[in-house]
Regions:
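Tandem repeat scaffolds
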Residues: 1-197
Length: 197
């Protein structure tokens, strides 16, 4: 397996669908465009890895993606609970239907990211840049979005029950049928938003 791991790290093996890589050290690996759908990457170390445009519809529970390049990656329906995203490049990735409960995504540039139908309950998105992000039908109950930039974001049908949006920028965000029960909106910019609480 050692030779295979070295080939994987160097990007020589990119068809990894269904592979069990739980707990594997793939830090700094070049997996751009790799197919890791249905793979088990729980607890894997992917810190600093190049995962641009990779298909990661997989179990990544507890994995380390800190500093990884995730631009354009496909995480649809993935299990990302307990994943570290610190300093990761995440623009234009797709997290539709993914499990991101309690995820730490604060201070990241999440512009253009697709979070449609994602489970972001209790997630930390404070000071994140979510310009034009699609959070339609996402569950953000109890999430921290304080100081987040949600300009022109799509929040249609999203659940923000008890979420903290203190100081958030919602300029021209789309908020049809959004659930706001108990959400904190102190000092939030709602200009250009047809907010009807």
């Amino acid at each position: 397996m050692t030779n295979d791991l070295e080939a994987i790290r160097k990007g020589k093996i990119l068809m990894l669908a269904g592979t069990d890589l739980a707990g594997t050290d793939l830090a700094g690996a070049d997996l751009a465009g790799a197919d890791l759908s249905q793979a088990n990457l729980s607890g894997a170390n992917l810190a600093g890895a190049n995962l641009q445009r990779a298909v990661l519809r997989a179990n990544l529970r507890g994995a380390d993606l800190s500093g990884a390049d995730l631009r354009g990656a496909d995480f649809r329906n993935a299990d990302l609970r307990g994943v570290s995203f610190a300093n990761a490049l995440v623009r234009d990735a797709s997290f539709g239907g993914a499990f991101l409960t309690g995820a730490a995504l604060g201070n990241l540039d999440l512009s253009g990211v697709d979070f449609r139908g994602a489970d972001l309950r209790g997630a930390s998105l404070g000071r994140a840049i979510l310009l034009g992000a699609d959070l339609s039908n996402a569950n953000l109950s109890g999430a921290d979005l304080s100081g987040a930039d949600l300009e022109e974001a799509l929040l249609n049908g999203a659940v923000l029950r008890g979420a903290n949006l203190t100081g958030a920028n919602l300029l021209c965000a789309s908020i049809e049928q959004t659930v706001w029960d108990g959400a904190l909106l102190d000092r939030a910019c709602l200009q250009g938003t047809p907010l009807s609480l």
